[in-house]
Amino acid sequence: MTAAPLRLHPDRLFPADPDTRVVARRLYAEVAGLPIVSPHGHTDPRWFAEDAPFGDASSLLLQPDHYVFRMLYSQGVPLEAIGIGAPVDPRAAWRVLADHYHLFRGTPSRLWLDWVFHSVFGLDVRLAPETADLTFDSINEQLARPEFRPRALFDRFNIELLATTESPLDPLDHHAAIRASGWTGRVITAFRPDPVVDPDFEGFAANLDRLGAMTGEDVGSYAGYLAALRARRAAFAAAGATSTDHGHPTAATADLDRGEAERLYAQVRGGGATAEQAELFRAHMLTVMAEMSIDDGLVMQIHPGSFRNHNADLFRRFGRDKGADIPTRTDFVRALRPLLGRFGNDPRLSLILFTLDESAYARELAPLAGHYPALKLGPAWWFHDSPEGMRRFRRQTTETAGFHNLVGFNDDTRAFLSIPARHDVARRIDCGYLAELVVEHQLDEDEAADLAVDLTYRLVKSAYRL
């Protein structure tokens, strides 16, 4: 069987209307070569600290990417067959992906992976069962070369800044090694306190003990707990962090008085909290984190509304982040009011909101961000950082929030090699949307070109204080 060619059309994702497409091409030409600013993501800082060669195609492109393996699992492929939870021959795992690559037609994963195959590795045949070994061998051969090591790819991808995400319990040794190495690539961390502010996080009590040991603070008291959090925030800022990130089940906030907070902390610290008390503690700690952000200047991100680890059996067998997180309906208007009542009018706070509940875009999020000085909207996230998801986001938020209450794009990925592809998709979608506004005579083309640069580069640097 003849292998199908792999081509990337230069007009991919541009509007189908010919007149609009011509404008989109011109706008895209203004931003295609701009540096990548990636202010939020989950790549491994060890890669850039050690700069060791990546192992093989499967361990790099398949096993870390839950977008990919959740689709395979949905079609009955055991995770063990691709090397998750059990050792497997990397070539055999790659053949599994090739055998099922047709599942990704019409998905953003197909766009990203095809870009990686074509633009990073120079492949000119589509991944399929008959090309599995050819592509596997070609990728592995290239990964052994110096120009495919993490730092070389970072430079080749024209990345100006890349933020990873770490727990307060992380000693940040890899970030220290990056800074000490003399390499000029800018890789910074971000503060993700979920393991020590969410009573439902596995090992919460032990995590608090580790937090106390790391900081020398007495986390047996609420005052010592807050002091320990401040100490770790300061350590993260010293390591280059400009932001925090909070992955709570809901966007609930609360503003407890000191006595209430102390009693609630004692309850969750002791392990006897009810579900309602755990939610109240998370809610209160978001408000506390906002106050700390005003003090230390760290931008605050909230990523709520994911039902984590929905597949209990999969979580028991493989742990978290295995493709079983599901979007939920999320309230923002009532949930955020306690926090916004304290700090929403303070421009020193920069609070970036994300959602998996698209129904909230126009009804809640755009009106909130279009009013409160402290609020901005993050881009389409996770299940929605797709071409259609990005278009829906633009159409439902721009009229109320404008462009400058948004923060540009972030890729939020573990898949390092897909970062340029994800940013390219966002640039193409934004240029297509702006081209529509030009053709409809809502914007002049010079304004659209200026906005294209804002959405690609300037807004993200401003919002994340980079």
UniProtKB/Swiss-Prot annotation:
<dbReference type="GO" id="GO:0042840">
    <property type="term" value="P:D-glucuronate catabolic process"/>
</dbReference>
<dbReference type="InterPro" id="IPR003766">
    <property type="entry name" value="Uronate_isomerase"/>
</dbReference>
<comment type="pathway">
    <text>Carbohydrate metabolism; pentose and glucuronate interconversion.</text>
</comment>
<comment type="similarity">
    <text>Belongs to the metallo-dependent hydrolases superfamily. Uronate isomerase family.</text>
</comment>
<dbReference type="GO" id="GO:0008880">
    <property type="term" value="F:glucuronate isomerase activity"/>
</dbReference>
<protein>
    <recommendedName>
        <fullName>Uronate isomerase</fullName>
        <ecNumber>5.3.1.12</ecNumber>
    </recommendedName>
</protein>
<keyword id="KW-0413">Isomerase</keyword>
<dbReference type="GO" id="GO:0019698">
    <property type="term" value="P:D-galacturonate catabolic process"/>
</dbReference>
<dbReference type="Pfam" id="PF02614">
    <property type="entry name" value="UxaC"/>
</dbReference>
<dbReference type="InterPro" id="IPR032466">
    <property type="entry name" value="Metal_Hydrolase"/>
</dbReference>
